[in-house]
Amino acid sequence: MLKLFLIRHGETEWNRIGRLQGHSDTNLSPEGLQQAQIFVKHLPFQHVDAIYSSDLSRAVETAKVIADKFNLPVKKMPILREMNYGIWEGRDIAELIEESPKEFGKFFTDPERCHPPRGETFLECQARLMIGIREIIADHDNQNVVVVSHGAAIRLIISAALDIPIHRLWAISQVNMAVNILRVENGDFTVELLNGTDHLRHL
C-alpha cells in the first residue's frame, strides 16, 4: 500500500489578489512561507520516503520546507505543474469575468468545455498530471510519498482518482497549504483526508 500526501503550495501574492498563475513562475508570499513552516510543525505523518514537486517556484519552495524536516531531496517534475491557462495567465479573475463572461465563465461553470486560448483544457491537464502520478506510484510501492502541486492540479488528480466528473471539479475544496491523503492499493484510490487544514489554525 502506498500513501500519497498531496499538498497544495502555500499562498502567493497572486493567490491573495485573485490573479491566475498557471505556468507563471511565482514565489511564496511571507504568509505562504509561514504556512509551510507551520505545516511541518503539525505534520499528519511521521515518516516520508520521497518528496516530489512541480518545478514551479511556489511549489518547490513549499516542498523544500518539508524536505528539510526529513533531510530529503526535492524531486522536481514539470509534469506536475499547474494547468496552463494560456493568455489568461497573469490576469485578475474578476477582470476576466467582466471582460469575457461567456468564455471565461466556463472556467467555473462548465470546465469540461473550457479551453483557455493557447492553454490546456482541464482534460488535457488531468491526463498529463496522471502520467506523473502513475510514475510515482510505480516507483514507490508500500511507501509514504509527498507530492506538492497546485490548486486546480490537485483537484484534477483527486477527481481522476475518485472518478469525479470534471464538471464537479470546483466542488473539491482546496485552500493554500491544504493536505490530502490518498491510499493507493492495487491501483485503487481511497481518500483518508481531503483539504486538511487543521495545521492552519496555529497561524
Task: Please describe what each predicted stretch is.
Residues 192-203:
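Acidic, His/Gly-rich catalytic cores of divalent-metal-dependent hydrolytic chemistry
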Residues 2, 47-49, 141-145:
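Short coil/turn segments at beta-strand junctions that form active-site/ligand-binding loops
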Residues 16-19, 102-116:
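Short, basic/glycine-rich phosphate-binding loops at helix/coil junctions
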Residues 5, 75-77, 192:
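General small-molecule cofactor/ligand-binding pocket signal
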Residues 10, 151, 197:
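Active-site metal-binding loops of divalent metal-dependent hydrolases
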Residues 5-65, 116-130:
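Loop-to-helix element that buttresses phosphate recognition and phosphoryl-transfer chemistry
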Residues 60, 131-190:
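Active-site-adjacent alpha-helix immediately C-terminal to a catalytic or transition-state-stabilizing loop
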Residues 39-104:
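Phosphate-coordination/substrate-recognition cap region in phosphate-metabolizing enzymes
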